[in-house]
């Protein structure tokens, strides 16, 4: 029921000894400052957390079902990694690890608590360097205490189910992936016009039960679990095709990763 952890100060002392650093006061006891010689280019960054997306679903990694033709095509023309592992089995684990560089801790949701913890991570570093940080999710912003946690830890704007038309909500997890992506584009266009670099998170949901296949998408698979992967891939394709038409596209880095691995 409970994790057996060593005392916090002992863990900090051990890590400082191993890393040979004293940390940075007010940021982290094991942080180090990195100074770049070159002037930062300040490209926009769009990071897409793909719900439960795993390598075993892609043709490149051995799947014969042809569920992810677009992701497979991106893999061949992008900077890609064969041994990349998402953290934990819950979305909050993957977000926490990816954005704030902490490992997932079993049986704990680091985003919840009576007092919202303050962390240094990718969002806060980018914000300190002049970025506008936006987060788009399909469901209610209070889910997993995301709204309070993200606003406390570097995000300026959060868009969630309460911002979307009620007729676009399809289940308890909110709107479809392709609607989320369509909704985000005009907002990103406005931010680009302000000539301030932006860091944007898009958190998808489609590949999470209960699965909802929109009427306007026609999958070739017969199993619902496969159809939803086809839809998720198609929705990403639609977003990237539209993003490619925008003036900010060439100055933007797109990062796609699975938020976590679904329990098998």
PLM segments and residue spans:
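Soluble catalytic regions of membrane-associated enzymes that act on cell-envelope
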Residues: 1-264
């Amino acid at each position: 029921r409970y994790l057996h952890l060593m005392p916090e100060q002992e863990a900090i002392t051990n890590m400082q000894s191993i890393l040979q650093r004293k940390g940075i006061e007010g940021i982290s006891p094991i942080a180090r400052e990195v100074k770049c010689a070159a002037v930062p280019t300040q490209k926009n960054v769009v990071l897409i957390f793909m719900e439960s997306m795993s390598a075993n679903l892609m043709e490149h990694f051995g799947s014969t079902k042809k569920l992810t033709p677009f992701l497979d095509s991106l893999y061949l023309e992008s900077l890609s990694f064969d041994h990349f592992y998402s953290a934990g089995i819950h979305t909050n684990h993957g977000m926490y690890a990816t954005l704030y560089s902490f490992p997932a801790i079993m049986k704990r949701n680091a985003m919840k608590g009576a007092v919202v913890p303050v962390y240094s991570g990718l969002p806060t570093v980018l914000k300190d360097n002049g970025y506008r940080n936006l987060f788009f999710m399909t469901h209610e912003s209070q889910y997993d205490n995301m709204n309070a946690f993200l606003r406390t830890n570097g995000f300026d704007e959060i868009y969630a189910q309460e911002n979307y038309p009620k007729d676009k909500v399809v289940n308890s997890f909110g709107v479809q992936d392709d609607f989320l992506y369509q909704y985000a584009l005009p907002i990103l266009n406005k931010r680009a016009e302000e000539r301030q670099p932006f860091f944007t998170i898009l958190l998808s949901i489609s590949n999470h039960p209960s699965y909802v296949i929109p009427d306007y998408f026609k999958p070739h698979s017969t199993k619902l679990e496969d159809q939803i992967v086809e839809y998720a891939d198609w929705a990403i394709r639609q977003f990237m095709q539209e993003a490619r038409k925008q003036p900010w596209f060439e100055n933007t880095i797109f990062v796609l990763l699975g938020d976590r691995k679904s329990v098998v």
